[in-house]
Each structure stands twice: as structure tokens, then as C-alpha cells.
Amino acid sequence: AVWAMEQHIKRGDFTPEEYEIAFGEENHLDSMTFALEDGEKMFFSGVVDRMDSIEDDENKYLKIIDYKSGKQKFDFAKIFHGLQMQLIIYMNAMMELYEKKTGKRVYPAGMFYFHLDDPIVNVEHENEAEDKILKDLKMSGVVNEDFQLIDHMEHTGSEGYLTLPVRATKNGYDKRSSVLNTTQLFNLGRIVEKKMTELGNSLMHGDI
């Protein structure tokens, strides 16, 4: 798994910026403060395993990675049912935190689960092993569909994308690709904020 992480970094231009980034009430993040019924508030705290970034003079783009000991598949349906909101919450928090820190406009580039594993692969030729391992450890998540951002995350060749949940075609990306545009990613963040507020109100009413 460590080798695969190194390959992820080498294959792109994003660089690891911080590890185990804790955030909570003390950061005064609007996106982590949920206004509930009867004037109550709910604060969310957490720890982001790793954040990679790339930036220019005015903009900063973030890539969030959450390490998992077991395989975790990113599932839009679960998000809309309020069951798998962690990555989106983390991205909301990091975007607001780094806008405050840098004064730049901050955008989501990608959010991923990375399975910590050391797979055993069977290949005919030794030079195929590395690609097979990377494919077996391909991250699950959602990617900003902007081609330049995807290229910054992984420079690909004829072998296709080995680290990202993306399949390229002559006309863009095929339907198996987990991609959204920037507006859709921001909207996903708002949906999760609404779901968190609903969850907070349910907890207040004892509906668990």
C-alpha cells in the first residue's frame, strides 16, 4: 500500500499538503455548524487522513483521501439517503478552512477512499505487476470532470487511469466514470449539509 501511495503522487502534480487534519468547533467553520430547530446548534468535528493540493496565484484545488482498512465503495445513492456523507463533509470543511487560511478560491478536485492493502497479483510478465497492483488498489470516490485537473491528478498513457475511478473515451468519459462538474460537486456539498441538519433534528427528537 505504501508503494501504491508513492506511485499515486509520482503519477500526478498534486502534492500531499497535510496529514491527519483535525477540525471542529474551535475552527468556527460555518459549513460544520448546523442550525437546528428551537435555536439549537450542532457542531461536527473530524480528522481528514490526507489532503493533497495544487494551486495558482488565485485558486487552490483540493484532493481528499480517507484511508480504509477494508474496501469501501463510493455510492451516490447512499449519500442521498444520508448514509455515506463523510467524504463530502470533509471536503466542505477543508474548502472553508483553506479559503480562510489562504484567501484564495478553493475548489474540489476529488474525494476518495483508499484501501490499505497489499494485494497478491498473478501476471504472466513481471512488468505487468505494478499496473495490476495499482488497478487493484484504484481509489473509489468522485472526481472533478475538468480534464486539466484530472491530468494533474494522474498523467495517464495507453494503460488508462490506474489510480482514479475514470475511464476516458474519445468524447470524454464513459458512464462508468465517477465524475461531476464543479457546480455539481458544490451542490453535493449543499445536499449533505441539508442531510446533516435533518439528522441533527432527528437526534433531538429521539429518532435514531
Give, region by region, the residue ranges found by the protein language model.
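Structural signature of nuclease core domains in nucleic-acid processing machines
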Residues: 1-208
